[in-house]
Each structure stands twice: as C-alpha cells, then as structure tokens.
Amino acid sequence: MFNMNINSPVRFVKETNRAKSPTRQSPYAAGYDLYSAYDYTIPPGERQLIKTDISMSMPKFCYGRIAPRSGLSLKGIDIGGGVIDEDYRGNIGVILINNGKCTFNVNTGDRIAQLIYQRIYYPELEEVQSLDSTDRGDQGFGSTGLR
C-alpha cells in the first residue's frame, strides 16, 4: 500500500517572482525552510497568514507538516494549523502567532517555518459501542507524570 518512490522529486511552482524556493540548511535537516513572499507586521497576541507564493504537489501517501523554526520559537512566534493535504495545490500559507510581548516584523524573504514531509495512512473508521480496555484507560493530561 505504501509503494512510494522516495527518489522522486517533489514538484513545486513559484506563483510570483516574490516566491523563494524551499531550502534545507544542512544535508540532514528534517524540514525545508519556507520563506515569506511579503512584509507583515504581527502585534503581540495576534496572528497573521503569511503567504509563500509557493504551491506544490505532495508525494503520494504523504502530507506536509508545517513546523515552527526554533529561532522564531525563542522569540515567542508559533505556528497555527500546519497541515498540507496530499491533494492541496494552492498557495502555501503559514499562520504565525505572536505570543511575545513585542510587535514582530516579517520581511520578504524571511524564513518563517519548515515543511516536513510525513507519511500518512487513510484508515477506514468503524463505530463501535466500546473500546478494548488498557492499563491507562481514560487517564489523560498529565496522568503519566513528569519523570
């Protein structure tokens, strides 16, 4: 079922001349950096959809996960949303959330997030009356402790 050629290139389109090709900063970087195609200002506590002006076709049985860049996370900038479905072909946008105390400026050409390709499984769902029991059961948030 997961017959995919990992050597096949991922095709992308620069929708405008403002777009910058996704890049990896090292040979073993997990993600490809995505770049802002425009200037934006994000006040503290606000969010903004940042356009990359890039569209691409995801590899079969993969989706694109938009992940934060660690350097931006240190400045209080996080990512909202973050899934590019296998069949999406539009302009890739990144929702940046400013959790910091200062206004955050995004300039054209800034690296704003990283795109990580991940395999996906499309299971059939089956509604049942109950689930198999486990030792953990319904114990959720924090139930396994910190250590």
Swiss-Prot record:
<feature type="binding site">
    <location>
        <begin position="68"/>
        <end position="70"/>
    </location>
    <ligand>
        <name>dUTP</name>
    </ligand>
</feature>
<feature type="binding site">
    <location>
        <position position="88"/>
    </location>
    <ligand>
        <name>dUTP</name>
    </ligand>
</feature>
<dbReference type="InterPro" id="IPR008181">
    <property type="entry name" value="dUTPase"/>
</dbReference>
<dbReference type="GO" id="GO:0004170">
    <property type="term" value="F:dUTP diphosphatase activity"/>
</dbReference>
<keyword id="KW-0479">Metal-binding</keyword>
<feature type="binding site">
    <location>
        <position position="111"/>
    </location>
    <ligand>
        <name>dUTP</name>
    </ligand>
</feature>
<feature type="binding site">
    <location>
        <begin position="82"/>
        <end position="85"/>
    </location>
    <ligand>
        <name>dUTP</name>
    </ligand>
</feature>
<feature type="binding site">
    <location>
        <position position="95"/>
    </location>
    <ligand>
        <name>dUTP</name>
    </ligand>
</feature>
<dbReference type="InterPro" id="IPR036157">
    <property type="entry name" value="dUTPase-like_sf"/>
</dbReference>
<keyword id="KW-0378">Hydrolase</keyword>
<comment type="function">
    <text>This enzyme is involved in nucleotide metabolism: it produces dUMP, the immediate precursor of thymidine nucleotides and it decreases the intracellular concentration of dUTP so that uracil cannot be incorporated into DNA.</text>
</comment>
<keyword id="KW-0460">Magnesium</keyword>
<keyword id="KW-0546">Nucleotide metabolism</keyword>
<dbReference type="GO" id="GO:0000287">
    <property type="term" value="F:magnesium ion binding"/>
</dbReference>
<feature type="binding site">
    <location>
        <position position="24"/>
    </location>
    <ligand>
        <name>Mg(2+)</name>
    </ligand>
</feature>
<feature type="binding site">
    <location>
        <position position="93"/>
    </location>
    <ligand>
        <name>dUTP</name>
    </ligand>
</feature>
<dbReference type="GO" id="GO:0046081">
    <property type="term" value="P:dUTP catabolic process"/>
</dbReference>
<dbReference type="Pfam" id="PF00692">
    <property type="entry name" value="dUTPase"/>
</dbReference>
<keyword id="KW-0244">Early protein</keyword>
<protein>
    <recommendedName>
        <fullName>Deoxyuridine 5'-triphosphate nucleotidohydrolase</fullName>
        <ecNumber>3.6.1.23</ecNumber>
    </recommendedName>
</protein>
<dbReference type="InterPro" id="IPR029054">
    <property type="entry name" value="dUTPase-like"/>
</dbReference>
<comment type="similarity">
    <text>Belongs to the dUTPase family.</text>
</comment>
<dbReference type="InterPro" id="IPR033704">
    <property type="entry name" value="dUTPase_trimeric"/>
</dbReference>
<dbReference type="GO" id="GO:0006226">
    <property type="term" value="P:dUMP biosynthetic process"/>
</dbReference>
